[in-house]
Regions:
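Hydrophobic transmembrane alpha-helical segments in integral membrane proteins
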Residues: 1-22, 159-166
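Short juxtamembrane and helix-loop transition motifs at transmembrane-helix boundaries
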Residues: 1-8, 27-37, 93
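N-terminal signal-anchor/start-transfer transmembrane helix
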Residues: 17-34, 176-177
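Hydrophobic, membrane-inserted alpha-helices
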Residues: 22-27, 48-57
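C-terminal membrane-adjacent module
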Residues: 106-189
Length: 189
């Protein structure tokens, strides 16, 4: 059972790197030719920055990373479908028949499916946020960000980067609060 869970988490992370990082990075560059798609991709990057914060929190073994990872999996699909405080797409679906818009619409469904698949994988680690004690899921979710950190930063101290991520949380919180207030104002007016 342990190896199946570990395999699923590794698979989830590998697919997430492709779907949530590599593809959107390339697609943003290509999408600059279509202002509507480019604005929607910028919304995605603002929201998905919580994933970067999560990786650095978990690489420093800061348990709040489980919560930020869970929240990112909720916020990202919401953002690709509804926008954020800075850009709110029209209520109508993404119009037009261009290839870029078709690719964006398809990618949006893939992102939604991936996040729906990922949420049950991280939920068993949520008790670790409040000191539920170490368990298999906590250890597995710490291991992959630590591997990433070592690959990218070598011998650097992950604790320093973890605390930088902690410092980024209030900034992200302000952005999120601004988005929530703006969304509320749009829906009640």
């Amino acid at each position: 059972m342990e190896t199946i869970i570990e395999w699923l988490i590794r698979l989830d992370v590998m697919v997430a790197v492709v779907v949530l990082i590599l593809f959107p990075l390339v697609f943003l560059g290509v999408a600059l030719r279509d202002a509507t798609v480019a604005r929607r991709m910028l919304v995605y990057w603002r929201v998905s920055s919580l994933l970067a914060i999560t990786v650095y929190l978990l690489s420093a073994e800061l348990a709040v990373g489980y919560l930020t990872g869970f929240l990112a999996l909720l916020f990202i699909p919401a953002a690709v479908w509804m926008g954020d405080a800075i850009y709110h797409p029209p209520d109508s679906p993404l119009p037009g028949a261009s290839r870029l818009r078709a690719v964006y619409r398809g990618w949006r469904w893939v992102v939604t499916g991936l996040c729906a698949f990922s949420i049950p994988l991280i939920m068993p680690a949520l008790p670790c946020v409040v000191g539920g004690g170490p368990n298999l899921f906590c250890d597995l979710w710490f291991a992959l960000p630590e591997e990433y950190f070592t690959f990218v930063h070598g011998e650097a101290d992950p604790t320093i980067w973890g605390w930088i991520a902690v410092g980024a949380l209030p900034v992200y919180g302000l952005y999120l609060a601004f988005s929530a207030v703006t969304w509320y104002q749009r829906t009640t007016s």
